[in-house]
Amino acid sequence: MKAIVRIILLSLCLYSCTEKQELPATFNYDTEVIAVFAPRGINDQSSAGQMYKGLTQITDAQKISFRPVFPLTFEEGAETLARLAGADQKGCKRLIISTDPGYSEHLQETASQGLIVNTDSTKLLIFDGDFKHDDVYVAHVPYYAMMYKAGYIAGKMNDVENVRIYIANDNYRYIREGRDGFIDGFSLSKANEVDVYDYSTINDDDTEGFMMRNIAYMSDAHECSKGDFDMILPICGETIWGFLRYNRENPGEFYTIGVGADMSIYSSDVPFSCVEHLDRIVSACVMDWMDNRLEHYRIFGLDEGWVELVVSEQYKSLMEPMSQEIHRQATEKEEHYAK
């Protein structure tokens, strides 16, 4: 049954420009956005969930077609992206979006072989691709500056001495940026070293670290609660929900920094969150594409408000001034780090 559903989805993506009779008269059926998501699935607060929301809203508002693809494996998703990006669909303006950096390596190889189409009718947009190519468009959402601010504020907290960063896999650019930014910011206000735990070192699958909420809840959070760590920073996708669940059930044992969205509503032990507004970012990309001004490489950073550090309500009076005082230095450090 799953195989049949996959075939139907892929068929819709490949031939959707011919499906005109089902669309209302005001609908621009010759313009479509196809987004290939990671096989991890989506929820409202996940990066994929935000992108799905943004794409749904902007395509509805512009009355253009939106075709999401949910592969069962990364291999299947990468093959779908390569096939779509390698076919110029005449008579249909098409934007193909790779929503997950896990596809970057495969797409880089595909581009280097000259197998990606870049025409007025077909363009490929990669989110956080770790390479540049004339036939590929990249939207980069940098983590360094906002994580630098988070590290600086964490180091100023009197009850925070030992911090651990949980990362899913340091092969991902934004994860490396977030890790390094936090460590650099923390070292500015406190001399203690920051511990880093990489989930990819215990998994055969490089993507498993994004989906270990049960391990986080049943094992890793208990380790933190023993007093080894006062604060954790989980840059590991869905895995963060295991830590937040433990925080809710055992308040006051350690702080968890929210990542991706404002997560203060899930636990009082979230002092601040590193937020990326991916719904707005992907909408901006679609509008640029529709207006024929899509940039080959665009950065959606802290200064423009595409990402930000959001302080939880009960900590605002204490931490907002810290966030403001370190803002300029964080952005300058990010510029230097990126070079």
State where each predicted segment sits.
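Bacterial signal peptide processing site
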Residues: 18-20
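C-terminal motif of bacterial Sec signal peptides marking the signal peptidase cleavage site
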Residues: 13-16
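An alpha-beta-alpha
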Residues: 55, 148-193, 297-318
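Periplasmic-binding protein-like
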Residues: 90-101, 125-127, 226-237, 257-259
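Hydrophobic alpha-helical segments within soluble ligand-binding/sensing domains
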Residues: 139-161, 275-294
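Extracytoplasmic "Venus flytrap"
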Residues: 27-29, 33-54, 58, 67-78, ...
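Hinge/cleft segment of the Venus flytrap/periplasmic-binding protein
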Residues: 284-339
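Flexible loop/hinge segments that line or gate small-molecule binding clefts
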Residues: 117-141, 261-269
